[in-house]
Regions:
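Conserved ABC ATPase "signature" region
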Residues: 6-23
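Conserved catalytic motifs of ABC-family nucleotide-binding domains
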Residues: 48
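Conserved H-loop
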Residues: 79-87
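Conserved ABC ATPase signature
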Residues: 27-34
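ABC ATPase "signature
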Residues: 110-111
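Catalytic Walker B motif of ABC-type/P-loop ATPase nucleotide-binding domains
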Residues: 52-55
């Protein structure tokens, strides 16, 4: 935080983006899982990274906290590159410009959700994922 130009402005921007005003005076360890997740992502953005890695950022969050985090991720799209891992197909489809599907540690397919649906003749993204991940052997 010491070498950040306009650090107070940046902190205020992140507090507003993540709606952290109501928990500013609390210690991080006393926050719920959702608030802790939002705080950790906000902290990771303080130095204006070009790439942000999010490993299952909504795991264990309730529906409302998950949607709030999705909203923040949507706000970040186009400003930085986000690499996000998830087991939730709805999340991958909703938040991603491009999706990479991995199986047994190997990247086996990359494309937009719609490209992947079309490629395997699926009715929806989850069906496309299953067909690709299993090699068509459901």
């Amino acid at each position: 935080v010491y070498k950040i130009k306009n650090k107070n402005k940046k902190i205020e921007e992140l507090v507003n983006m993540f709606k952290l005003q109501e928990v500013l005076k609390q210690k991080a360890k006393t926050l719920s899982g959702g608030w802790q997740r939002k705080l950790s992502i906000a902290i990771s953005l303080i130095n204006n990274p070009k790439i942000l890695f999010l490993d299952e950022p909504t795991l264990g969050l309730d529906v409302i906290a998950r949607r709030e985090l999705w909203s923040v991720i949507e706000q970040l799209k186009g400003k930085i590159t986000i690499i996000l891992t998830t087991h939730y197909m709805e999340e991958a489809e909703s938040l991603s410009d491009r999706v990479g599907i991995m199986s047994k540690g190997n990247l086996i397919e990359v494309g937009t959700p719609q490209e992947l649906i079309s490629k395997v003749g699926a009715n929806n993204f989850e069906e496309a994922f299953v067909k690709i991940a299993t090699g068509g052997k459901e």
